[in-house]
């Protein structure tokens, strides 16, 4: 019997872009941010990154909280950090909540559907490993009309551990037979490099970060590509 072939994808940032999040922020508070010489993209990235940092610190110290809750809580602090002296006088709670809601409106990247199809046509089973909740993440695929069975959507949120803790990847790796072909694919170098450390083969797409900053990571990627379809083709070729 031939070895089974699997690719586990990160979702948010890899399969899904942040454009809708940034656009939502711009729609809700863009003019207010502009009055402080702050762009929606700059604030959105800073807010999201600050939330990821606190989310990870909470997880590491065994006080795991859902990411969406952390994102909401960090809103006013982030505004202050980017130069708004009195954030609550500039933005209302209702506007904050509307900005948080925009995070649920993320859309699949161009090429994501083609990427999955290339892999499935080559006999791969496509999985997703996310720190987000399955309902929200599944909605990204459902709205785009892209097949992603719920049973193939894995969240480490319920385990009380967040990527890139190595313990977040090991249960997924353990689902597969030792001789199976097992890839992890992401547009975050911190994510895919951690997956490689537990035993996955690594595929990295530059579509989000552009610069992999490879010098600070101690793992080598077998596939690096600029688009999701090209990454999929590299995985197929590398598995022959």
Predicted feature descriptions by range:
Residues 1-3, 113, 117, 129, ...:
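Asp-based, Mg2+/Mn2+-dependent phosphohydrolase catalytic module
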Residues 1-49:
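Active-site neighborhood of HAD-like aspartate-dependent phosphohydrolases
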Residues 25-29, 47-51, 71-72, 99-103, ...:
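Hydrophobic alpha-helical core bundles mediating ligand binding, dimerization, or RNAP-core interactions
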Residues 31-37, 82-89, 145-149:
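Short helix-capping segments at alpha-helix termini
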Residues 41, 45-97:
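A metal-dependent, Asp-based hydrolase signature
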Residues 50, 122-123, 156, 179:
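Structured helix-beta-strand junction loops
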Residues 64, 68-69, 87-128:
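Short, acidic loop-to-helix structural element flanking the phosphoryl-transfer center
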């Amino acid at each position: 019997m031939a070895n089974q072939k699997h690719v586990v994808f990160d979702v948010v940032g890899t399969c899904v872009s942040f454009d809708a999040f940034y656009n939502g922020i711009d729609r809700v508070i863009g003019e207010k941010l502009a009055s402080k010489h702050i762009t929606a993209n700059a604030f959105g990235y800073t807010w999201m990154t600050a939330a990821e940092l606190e989310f990870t610190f909470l997880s590491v110290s065994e006080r795991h909280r859902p990411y969406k809750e952390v994102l909401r809580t960090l809103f006013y602090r982030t505004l202050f950090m980017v130069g708004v002296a009195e954030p609550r006088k500039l933005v209302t709670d209702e506007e904050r909540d509307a900005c948080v809601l925009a995070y649920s409106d993320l859309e699949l990247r161009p090429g994501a559907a083609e990427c999955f199809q290339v892999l499935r046509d080559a006999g791969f089973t496509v999985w997703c490993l996310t720190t987000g909740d399955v309902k929200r993440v599944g909605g990204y695929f459902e709205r785009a009309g892209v097949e992603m069975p719920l049973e193939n959507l894995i969240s480490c949120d319920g385990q009380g551990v967040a990527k890139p803790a190595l313990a977040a990847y090991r249960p997924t790796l353990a689902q597969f037979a030792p001789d199976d072909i097992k890839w992890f694919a992401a547009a975050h170098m911190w994510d895919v490099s951690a997956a490689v450390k537990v035993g996955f083969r690594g595929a990295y797409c530059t579509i989000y970060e552009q610069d992999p900053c490879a010098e600070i990571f101690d793992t080598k990627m077998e596939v690096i590509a600029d688009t999701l379809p090209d990454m999929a083709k590299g995985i197929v070729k590398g598995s022959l």
